Amino acid sequence: MKQIILTTITILYVSAIFGQTKTNNGFADFNEFKLNKPSLKFDFQLKQRSGGDIFLTGGISNYRLKKIKPVNEVGKVEEKIWGVTVGDSIYINAYPFSKVKGYNLIIEKGYYTYFIGEPARTEKEQRELGIIKPTEKQIMVCCQAGYVILPDGTIKLLRPELLLDLCKDNDDLAKEIKAANFKLENVYKMNDILKKYNLTKK
């Protein structure tokens, strides 16, 4: 009996790590993610970037999809689809909004969905994400950043002023945000505010 249980656990673990599935596991766009109805199916190995890889090439500890099958879909998986699901977790493709290859774990899906990713490095994407203002030029970026996905699918850098605007209809949270005087690097604390706000929308 113990051997059967161990074998079952091993199979489930390997399936989760390698993303092998008989059901659809790829989201073509935001609407599929919102409805939780992936229309695409791939086999792949989900790997978190190692410290050595980050040291050599830069970036953050996000994820890569390896050994993608079918092989003729590699470009699509790396640069075009919205995201993938592995077990109970969802990973958003960073390339469409940042032009940086990799996948980021969705921390919470709700009225406002949020995750931590790498800042965009190109001017067009920096402007669209709110990293720079319309009149500003491209800037050098590094390290990780907080992102929020609005109800219409728009992705924005989670700035303190944006957080206040998103939660302004909740007096208690608005007061908490103002009192906290958040900085851009206070990603996890701002995520906690979004989590509280999402609870009011259920």
Region annotations inferred by a language model:
Residues 22-174:
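Aromatic-patch recognition
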Residues 164-202:
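C-terminal partner/receptor-binding element of secreted or periplasmic proteins
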Residues 6-9, 138, 180:
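Generic marker of residues within folded, mature protein domains
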Residues 1-24:
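Bacterial Sec-dependent N-terminal signal peptides
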